[in-house]
């Protein structure tokens, strides 16, 4: 799920923390990828027609492998160096959120059955996406694929995004590639969204800077964590009736959740019973992560014959397509070997602002300006949403 409404909140209150980057701007950059989150997205989107997912002749789902193969190939061809990190066991505090997700899946499955019986194809397609779940076997298949492609791959002891953030803080990678904004709550120095989007989507990479985030909001690191808990996170519930804007206002006024609870009308804004916000805060401050101190990251040439054995012979992929991917990656590696990184390659970042929740009016000078100019909106980022189910 990430942090509810955080992107919109930053767009309005700390636009300098966000910038649009070209995909090619990440040439020679190391990026830790939240693999588990992206596998789920591939299971929903890649090769889906109605409620039918991409499968091989044996009926095995291959959407996760197809999606990861093509997105990984695109990154490697662009000179990006991905590091894949997979979820380990969920933290105990996430049990409530996981139970809610299970209930929602069961509700969706019941509604899906009714939609099938009614012949409502639009509802069938929508509801079938809500019933998707990623198995341990599918995660291990993607890890095997990454290793055959010559990419470092790790299973985190707990949440993948927390270990990704630890890698970024340690300087092992430049940024974390994920759609989940709670990676920023784990204090990852840079978070890159849309890095795994298909080329056809033509989405710029949306990069968030942690230090500029807390500076732009006027908060300390601890206050930012409390803000994220108030907005809504995976680890605990939040105060009913308090959305992101109100949460920011309250944190700025009172400084902490404890002080907020002392000050607000709890009948108007009832907090959850036995609210474990302190436990959630501790999870964000000191998450269980992999020891990254002794990690030596290296990228190798793809194991072409190993990929053919796995994808073609086991999973019925087309051999010419698999070999074509390997050829493109080899060509990119050869080109990268003869290049040095040029800082001039990066154009000036485009700082973006948003009109989410408010209308920006351009003030006129010396009486100049028209009504048309006064009513013109600046480009927002409301299309960017975190999604974790």
Swiss-Prot record:
Annotated region described as N-domain, given as residue ranges: 1-105
Q: Which organism is it from?
A: Ostreococcus tauri
| This protein's name | Flap endonuclease 1
Location of the region described as Interaction with PCNA in the Swiss-Prot/TrEMBL record: 338-346
Organism lineage reads as: Eukaryota, Viridiplantae, Chlorophyta, Mamiellophyceae, Mamiellales
Q: Where is the composition biased (Basic residues)?
A: 374-389
- Which PROSITE patterns does the record cross-reference, listed alphabetically? XPG_1
State the free-text cofactor note: Binds 2 magnesium ions per subunit. They probably participate in the reaction catalyzed by the enzyme. May bind an additional third magnesium ion after substrate binding.
Q: What class of enzyme is it?
A: hydrolase
Q: Which InterPro entries match?
A: 5-3_exonuclease, 5-3_exonuclease_C_sf, Flap_endonuc, HhH2, PIN-like_dom_sf, XPG-I_dom, XPG/Rad2, XPG_CS
Q: Recorded GO terms, molecular function?
A: 5'-3' exonuclease activity; 5'-flap endonuclease activity; DNA binding; magnesium ion binding
The EC number(s) this enzyme carries: 3.1.-.-
Residues that bind Mg(2+) 1: 34, 87, 159, 161
Tell me the HAMAP family matching this sequence. Fen (MF_00614)
Residues covered by region (I-domain): 123-254
Q: Which GO terms describe its cellular component?
A: mitochondrion; nucleolus; nucleoplasm
